[in-house]
Amino acid sequence: MSTNEWIRFVRSFAKSTCGLLVVLCAASTAVGQTGNTHPLDPAIQIARQSLQQSQRSVQDYTATLVKRTRVNGELPEHQFMAVKIRNRKTMDGQLATPMGVYIKFLKPKDVEGREVIWVEGQNRGQLVAHESGFKNIMRVNLDPTGYLAMRGQKYPLTDIGIENLLLKIIDTAQNERNYDGTTVQAYRGARVGDRACTMIQVTHPVKQPHFSFYRAQVFFDDEYNLPIRYVSWTWPETEGGEPVLEEEYTYMHLKLNVSLTDRDFDPDNPDYNYP
């Protein structure tokens, strides 16, 4: 998908979502806290079931990850990445399969061709990367949380992946469950590209220090029961203004259980361009 195609997708998606909000508002779920229940409870249950399913039956996957995150107040252009991710697996409380990550940056032009590999428990916990173009002269080993690896990033590479996204969603929702002031709505019939989804929208109309966002939307693929898009906004800067986009992640062309091997996370793989 080209940058222009992505822009058209976002615009058409925004229009269709607005229509969806109008049409389904009366049928959506929007509840306030009562007794020991909370409006987030159904969303937490959906996320937990999704995580359990992934941990049980998804070994690995490939996708085109499109992301944009605000860093130091600046919102950059979308980054497009071809990713291979092997999920972490345990057996009898012991690590059986370490998480593995391979990323090849596709866009924008200034990062096109950059490759990054990280494997849990290997290379002293460091990622191994190389730059693109004429700067591709050496491999570098970097602390995932260090300055160089975090430059232009909101989260470390070790936080990537659908299971980590689900863990973040569950953790955030569990914390917010301690407070009033949350509205939750569910919309069927949403789409991400050609994938049919159910969208869960969480809104905090009144800004409070214990809330990290104004509105967040999670799109669960109806076939896979996995979140393939997450987007959040902070509160409008002026009364009656538009919410401020904070971060968005979309997993396009997702393929599950593609039998990735250790070779897929080896910088010496001849299919890669490591020097």
Task: Show the residue positions of the predicted features.
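Short, surface-exposed loop and linker segments with low hydrophobicity and enrichment for Pro/Ser/Thr
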Residues: 14-18, 51-58, 90-97, 190-196, ...
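Boundary at the C-terminal end of the N-terminal hydrophobic targeting segment
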Residues: 30-37
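N-terminal mature ectodomain segment of secretory-pathway/periplasmic proteins
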Residues: 42-136
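Short hydrophobic transmembrane-like helices used for membrane targeting/insertion
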Residues: 7-10, 22-23, 31
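Bacterial N-terminal signal peptides that target proteins for export
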Residues: 2-18
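Glycine-rich, flexible loop segments associated with nucleotide phosphate handling
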Residues: 40, 87, 95-103, 213-216, ...
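Gly/Pro-enriched, hydrophobic low-complexity segments
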Residues: 70-72, 109, 117, 123-275
